[in-house]
Amino acid sequence: MSNKVHLGHTARKRFGQNFLTDSNVINRIVGAISPDNDHVMVEIGPGLAALTEPVAESIDKLTVVELDKDLVERLQTHPFLKDKLEIHQGDALKFDFKQLVEEGKQMKVFGNLPYNISTPLMFHLFEFAEHIENMHFMLQKEVVLRLSAAPGTKAYGRLTVMAQYFCQVMPVLEVPPGCFTPPPKVDSAVVRLVPYKEKPYPCKDVDLLRHLCTTAFNMRRKTLRNNLKQLLNDDDFSALGIDASMRPEQITVQQYVAMANHLVDKRQA
C-alpha cells in the first residue's frame, strides 16, 4: 500500500494532507488541548480523526471545519463520532468562526493544519481572537519558530508581530516527520496561542498595524527609514524614540504598535 494511504484514504497534495499517526504525540496534544464542555470545542481539518476521536471521547459536542468532501462523509458515518459532531464542510480560510460562539462560552480551537495555508489561516483566526480562549495547532516547525521569535532574530517578521500582538505564544512540542502518513518533508511542532483578554499594547487601528508590518518587512535588509518613508519621517521616528536606521526585525511589538498609534494620531490631528 502507498505510504500516502492511511485508513483507506489517500492523502491529497492539494489539501496539504499529512495524517498524524503517532499515539504518544496524539495523547500529548490532547492533554495540552484539555477538552471540556465549558468551551465551544472547534477542530480545523479533522482529517481521519486522529485528534477528533480522543477529544470527542471526553466532551458532549465537537464542532469541526473540513474542506475535503470525502473526509466529511467519513465523519458523518463514523460509528462513534457522528452523534457528537457538528460538521461544517468548507474552507477554514473563509469561515466565519464567530457563528460558532455560544452565550457565555469562549472557543478552544485546535487542529493539525495543512502547512500550505497555515500562515494566512493564522491571520484569519486573529480576527476572532476576542472569542477564543486558546488555540493549539500542529504546524511546520519553521512557522512555530516565526510565531514565537524574539526581535533581532532571523525568524522574527510580520507574522511574529501580529501573533504576539494578539496572543501569548508558547511552543509545546516538536514532532518528527515519521509521526505522519505520508511523512512531510519538514519537521513539525505544536504551538499554544492564548489571546490576550487585555492587550499589553493596545492598537488604535489594527488594520493599519497590519499594513505597517507588511510594509516594514517587505525588504528586510533595508532600514525603517527606507521601508516606511511613505508613512513616517525622521521627525516621527524622533518623537517615538525609535532609531530610523534600524532594520524591521530589530523593532519590538510595542514599538510597532506605537508607530501605528502615532500614525492614527497624525491623521486625526
Curated annotation (Swiss-Prot):
EC number in record: 2.1.1.182
Record-listed S-adenosyl-L-methionine binding positions: 18, 20, 45, 66, 91, 112
Keywords of the record: Cytoplasm, Methyltransferase, RNA-binding, rRNA processing, S-adenosyl-L-methionine, Transferase
Catalytic reactions of this protein: adenosine(1518)/adenosine(1519) in 16S rRNA + 4 S-adenosyl-L-methionine = N(6)-dimethyladenosine(1518)/N(6)-dimethyladenosine(1519) in 16S rRNA + 4 S-adenosyl-L-homocysteine + 4 H(+)
Record carries keyword Methyltransferase: yes
GO-annotated molecular function: 16S rRNA (adenine(1518)-N(6)/adenine(1519)-N(6))-dimethyltransferase activity; RNA binding
SMART domains the UniProt entry points to: rADc (SM00650)
InterPro entries per the UniProt record, alphabetical: KsgA/Erm, rRNA_Ade_diMease-like_C, rRNA_Ade_Mease_Trfase_CS, rRNA_Ade_methylase_Trfase_N, rRNA_adenine_dimethylase, SAM-dependent_MTases_sf
Key word rRNA processing present: yes
Cell compartments where the protein resides: Cytoplasm
Gene Ontology CC terms, in alphabetical order: cytosol
SUPFAM superfamilies per the UniProt record, alphabetical: S-adenosyl-L-methionine-dependent methyltransferases
Pfam families recorded: RrnaAD
Catalytic class of the enzyme: transferase
Source species, domain of life: Bacteria
Family, similarity comment: Belongs to the class I-like SAM-binding methyltransferase superfamily. rRNA adenine N(6)-methyltransferase family. RsmA subfamily.
NCBIfam families xref list: ksgA (TIGR00755)
Main function: Specifically dimethylates two adjacent adenosines (A1518 and A1519) in the loop of a conserved hairpin near the 3'-end of 16S rRNA in the 30S particle. May play a critical role in biogenesis of 30S subunits.
Protein name in the entry: Ribosomal RNA small subunit methyltransferase A
Species the sequence originates in: Shewanella loihica (strain ATCC BAA-1088 / PV-4)
Phylogenetic lineage: Bacteria, Pseudomonadati, Pseudomonadota, Gammaproteobacteria, Alteromonadales
